Amino acid sequence: MIKKIYEFVRDDIHHSGDIGEQRVTCTASEVLEFGHGICCAKSHLLASMLRFFGIPAGFCYQKLCSSQEINKIVLHGLNAVYIKDFEKWVRLDARGNKPGVDAQFCIGKEKIAWPVNKKLGEEDNPIIFKEPNKTVVEILKTSRNRKELWMRWELGLKDLFDS
């Protein structure tokens, strides 16, 4: 069931950037209604759907170099899910696949969209959060469009990472 839910969010819910959508979604219901969201919004939907079926799920964050702007650091959101049969947490990235991005449901070896490159200063926040980060949610809820969201995204980085 976990894999089916994950693949639904990854494959059937678009990443807003991949389809050029400027509307910013935040809540699971908004993402489902409009059929798209950025990584963090899609993580809200995935956690909500998993939790509906009693499957423990949390929120994870990464600090990454932008693939679109040189010297720009961006925040990336993904999930962790508890796999009861294996008694372990596994990170899942429902961002959505595209050329160069191949996130998969994999218990043995993590297959997320953006593995960190520490040489570039990228970081994983090691915490699995019970709830989405409040600053991230506030930015998603108050940004009028995706362009405005990206200009404010640094606030989420500062809240989740020391640097």
Where are these regions (language model features)?
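Solvent-exposed, flexible loop/coil residues
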Residues: 19, 23, 28, 35-36, ...
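A structured, mid-to-C-terminal "fold-capping" secondary-structure block
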Residues: 105-163
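Histidine (H) residue identity feature
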Residues: 14-15, 36, 44, 76
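Short, charge-rich amphipathic segments
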Residues: 8-12, 42, 142-148
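Hydrophobic/aromatic-rich core segments of domains that either
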Residues: 41-128
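Secondary-structure capping and boundary motifs in well-ordered enzyme cores
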Residues: 31, 35-38, 71
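Active-site nucleophilic cysteine motif
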Residues: 1, 5, 35-45, 50
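Secondary-structure boundary elements
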Residues: 1-34
